[in-house]
């Protein structure tokens, strides 16, 4: 039997740009079952009516979310299908100086996929098993993914990420607004 397919949106750093959030949701071919929000704009999500649309929200707090009176953690681990995901904004792992510290943490936690924001730079990197990370070889592959910034600005195009999971396989993608 084929495992179910999960379609998710990966969003980060909206910084008040709720119109961009609505535009991203409207553009999706598959209604996402969840939004994975990587911080800096938690307050913005309230205007989307996600519960009424049947879309779950899984979020972490960013460095600019302190004003939001949120109890979301700065990092979390979760499974989608059989894929273990490490979510973080990244400021506590200093990702603006590079993502290797965050990736080493995700690898120690047994993650298959690291999702982070904060830098506003959309990127994806696949690290095969055996790759040296922090002086230690990876025991299994790790994909490192940043969706960029929903808000745009700071010299960056507004962007988002998608994640499709089936069993223990997954595919990440980037989109621009």
Q: What name fits each language-model region?
A:
Residues 54-56, 82-84, 141-142, 169:
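A generic structural signal for alpha->beta connector loops
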Residues 1, 74-82, 124-138:
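Short acidic-hydrophobic surface loop/beta-edge motif
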Residues 1-54, 65, 72-73, 156-159, ...:
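N-terminal active-site segment of His-dependent metallophosphoesterases
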Residues 56-97, 101-104, 108:
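Helix-adjacent hinge/juxtasegments
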Residues 2-5, 23, 104-110, 133-177:
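Binuclear metal-dependent phosphoesterase catalytic core
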Residues 15-19, 42-46, 64-69, 93-98, ...:
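Active-site environment of divalent metal-dependent phosphoester hydrolases
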Residues 10-12, 34-40, 58-63, 86-89, ...:
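Active-site neighborhood of phospho(di)ester-bond hydrolases with catalytic His/Asp-centered motifs
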Residues 29-30, 50-54, 80, 106-109, ...:
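Short, conserved loop/helix-junction motifs that constitute active-site signature segments
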């Amino acid at each position: 039997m084929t495992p179910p397919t999960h379609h998710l949106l990966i969003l980060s750093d909206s910084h008040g740009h709720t119109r961009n959030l609505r535009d991203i949701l409207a553009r999706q071919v598959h209604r996402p079952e969840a939004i994975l929000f990587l911080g800096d704009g938690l307050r913005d999500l309230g205007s989307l009516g996600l519960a009424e649309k049947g879309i779950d929200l899984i979020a972490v707090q960013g460095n600019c979310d302190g004003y939001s009176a949120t109890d979301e953690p700065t990092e979390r681990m979760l499974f989608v299908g059989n894929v273990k995901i490490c979510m973080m904004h990244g400021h506590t792992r200093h990702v603006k100086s590079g993502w290797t510290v965050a990736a080493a943490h995700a690898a120690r936690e047994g993650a298959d996929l690291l999702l982070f924001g904060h830098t506003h730079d959309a990127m994806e990197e696949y690290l095969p098993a055996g790759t040296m990370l922090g002086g230690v070889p990876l025991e299994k592959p790790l994909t490192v993914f940043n969706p960029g910034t929903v808000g745009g600005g700071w010299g960056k195009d507004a962007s988002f990420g998608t994640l499709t999971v089936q069993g223990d396989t997954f595919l990440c993608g980037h989109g621009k607004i």
